[in-house]
């Protein structure tokens, strides 16, 4: 149907700039899963771009598994769109209600530490962690890069950090966005990683190749550590730097001002589309550019070729068992507390160190 003014909410909320890049990474990740069937967990650092996660778990069918109203058809899609950033509906950021998520996406800086925590002593899990270039400037995130020093490939899983370097944060350029490729490579090499940069044209093929390289690197590191009698010290884990435009494939410019590839695409690119006819036309052209009629059938269900590489069952990242604590929880085994009791017959005569006793416990 043609776009009408009453199709548009009076107040539009959310963040666009990070969404296309994260959707791109999600799609590349599920393609890798379709090839090798690893257990992969998706962690969205810039979780304020929730549409990237919501749309993908909807497309893979996970959303509908947990919430009946989000079935993978026209009605479910309509419900998803209507209820995004809507009273009593879905929030504008990734939250605990999101299938497959273990991170609160509304506060930046904790994605990488969370990813490492998820894979410690969890040898079969790979956490794909998207780190925003603005997020990377926070203290917790900057420190978390060092967590690779504590990751034992013989006993733990792996983290695949993907720095989404789109060049801008909410109102200006980012530090990583201002760095040369050589500076970025040297930075991560100095941290003990093996970095690869994906940029330019034909990004789909480049990203597929680099994701495959990263996966094979992880497998080699883990195989060596788990089969060798000697301890494998300081492996160089892979890290990917994706340099793509902020607001990728969105509105290029409006009123003579650049939007795509600029901080203006961070949130809502055009907030007055109901009152500005020119902006309304830009919005309409933008929505039509996705050619939704080539992706879904008359019932709103994705065409078979669209789902060809989408994993099934628990291989879907939105259905990864490690994102649901109740599925993997184990009883916590405590020593018998009374064995560490300090016994005395008279006060003031017995000497004991509380730290030494606690250490024994």
Predicted regions and their residues:
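Conserved acidic/glycine
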Residues: 1-39, 46-47, 135-139, 158-162, ...
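Cofactor-binding active-site loop characterized by glycine-rich and histidine/acidic residues
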Residues: 2-152, 173, 357
């Amino acid at each position: 149907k043609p776009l009408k003014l009453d199709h548009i909410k009076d107040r539009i909320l959310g963040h666009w700039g990070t969404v296309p890049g994260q959707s791109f990474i999600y799609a590349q990740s599920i393609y890798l899963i379709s090839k090798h069937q690893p257990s992969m967990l998706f962690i969205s650092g810039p979780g304020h771009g929730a549409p990237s996660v919501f749309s993908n778990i909807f497309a893979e069918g996970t959303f509908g598994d947990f919430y009946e109203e989000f079935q993978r058809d026209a009605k479910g899609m309509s419900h998803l769109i209507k209820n995004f950033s809507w009273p009593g509906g879905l929030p504008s950021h990734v939250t605990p209600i999101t299938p497959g998520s273990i991170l609160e996406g509304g506060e930046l800086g904790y994605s990488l530490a969370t990813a490492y925590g998820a894979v410690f002593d969890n040898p079969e899990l790979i956490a794909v962690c998207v780190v925003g270039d603005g997020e990377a400037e926070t203290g917790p995130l900057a420190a978390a890069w060092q967590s690779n020093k504590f990751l034992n490939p013989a006993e733990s899983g792996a983290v695949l950090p993907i720095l989404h370097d789109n060049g801008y944060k909410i109102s200006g350029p980012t530090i990583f966005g201002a760095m040369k490729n050589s500076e970025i490579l040297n930075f991560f090499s100095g941290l003990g990683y093996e970095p690869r940069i994906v940029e330019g044209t034909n990004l789909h093929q480049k990203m597929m190749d680099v994701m495959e390289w990263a996966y094979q690197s992880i497998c080699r590191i883990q195989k060596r550590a788990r089969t060798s009698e000697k301890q494998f010290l300081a492996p160089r884990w892979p890290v990917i730097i994706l340099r793509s435009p902020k607001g990728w494939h969105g509105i290029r410019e409006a009123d003579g001002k650049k939007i795509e590839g600029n901080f203006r695409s961070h949130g809502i690119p055009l907030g007055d589309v109901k009152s500005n006819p020119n902006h309304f036309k830009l919005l309409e052209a933008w929505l039509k550019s996705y050619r939704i009629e080539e992706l879904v059938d008359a019932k709103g269900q994705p065409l078979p070729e669209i789902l060809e590489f989408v994993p099934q069952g628990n291989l879907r990242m939105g259905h990864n068992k490690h994102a649901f604590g109740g599925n993997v929880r184990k009883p916590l085994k405590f020593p018998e507390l009374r064995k560490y009791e300090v016994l005395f017959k008279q006060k003031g005569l017995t000497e004991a160190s509380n730290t030494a006793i606690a250490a024994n416990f």
